[in-house]
Regions:
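Extreme N-terminal starter segment of soluble prokaryotic enzymes
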Residues: 1-5
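Short, well-ordered beta-to-alpha junction loops that form the rim of enzyme active sites
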Residues: 10, 90-94
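Short, well-ordered, mixed-charge alpha-helical segments that flank or form enzyme active sites
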Residues: 14, 95-99, 148-149
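Short, surface-exposed acidic-centric catalytic microdomains
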Residues: 15-58
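Divalent-metal-activated hydrolytic enzyme cores
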Residues: 45-52, 57-73, 109-149
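Glycine-rich phosphate-binding loop signature in dinucleotide/nucleotide-binding domains
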Residues: 78-83
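Short glycine-rich phosphate-binding loop at a beta-alpha junction
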Residues: 84-90
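Active-site-adjacent alpha-helix immediately C-terminal to a catalytic or transition-state-stabilizing loop
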Residues: 95-113
C-alpha cells in the first residue's frame, strides 16, 4: 500500500520551532504533506513558550481548524485513492503532541514558571484527528521524539 506522511511543520523547517529548542531528529519518507505551524502562524516566530492549557481556547482551536481545512481536503482524496495516511506530531508539543503535551503555565506577569510533560494530545493534533475522523479517513499516529530518556 502507498503511504503519505502528514507532518508537523517544524519537522521539516526547524526555524519555526520555539527559539532555543533543538531540532527534532526526523527523516521524512516522501511523499509528504507539511502542515502549517499553528503556533508560529498565530503567535509569531518571537513567541514565548506556551502550554496546552494556555492555548486550549475556542479562538486557537478555530484557527487550527481553519489552517487544516485545505490539507484535510487533499488528505481525504489521497485516502480515497488507497494511500495509508500517517500523521506525525512532535513529542511534548502543546499543539502537535501525539502521545505527550505540556501543562502548567498560568499566565500573569512574566516570572519563572514550571511546566510538565504529561500524557495527551496537543490542541492542533486534536483538531487534525477530529477532522479526519469526521471525514471517515483512516490514519496512523506517530510522535517524533527529541528528548533522550
Amino acid at each position: 500500500m502507498k503511504k503519505i506522511q502528514v507532518v508537523a511543520h517544524c519537522l521539516l523547517d526547524p526555524e519555526t520551532r520555539l527559539a532555543g529548542l533543538r531540532p527534532v531528529a526526523f527523516a521524512a519518507e516522501p511523499p509528504i504533506i507539511q502542515l502549517l505551524c499553528p503556533e508560529a502562524g498565530c503567535l509569531g516566530l518571537d513567541r514565548w513558550a506556551v502550554t496546552k492549557n494556555q492555548i486550549d481556547i475556542p479562538s486557537y482551536r478555530r484557527y487550527c481548524r481553519e489552517i487544516f481545512s485545505h490539507h484535510a481536503d487533499l488528505i481525504e482524496q489521497f485516502a480515497k485513492k488507497g494511500y495509508e495516511i500517517e500523521v506525525v506530531g512532535v513529542e511534548g508539543s502543546p499543539s502537535c503532541g501525539i502521545k505527550s503535551t505540556t501543562l502548567g503555565y498560568t499566565g500573569g506577569k512574566i516570572r519563572p514558571q514550571d511546566h510538565e510533560h504529561v500524557p495527551g494530545m496537543g490542541v492542533f493534533m486534536e483538531e487534525v484527528t477530529g477532522e479526519l475522523k469526521r471525514r471517515d479517513v483512516s490514519f496512523r499516529l506517530v510522535e517524533a521524539r527529541y528528548r533522550i530518556k
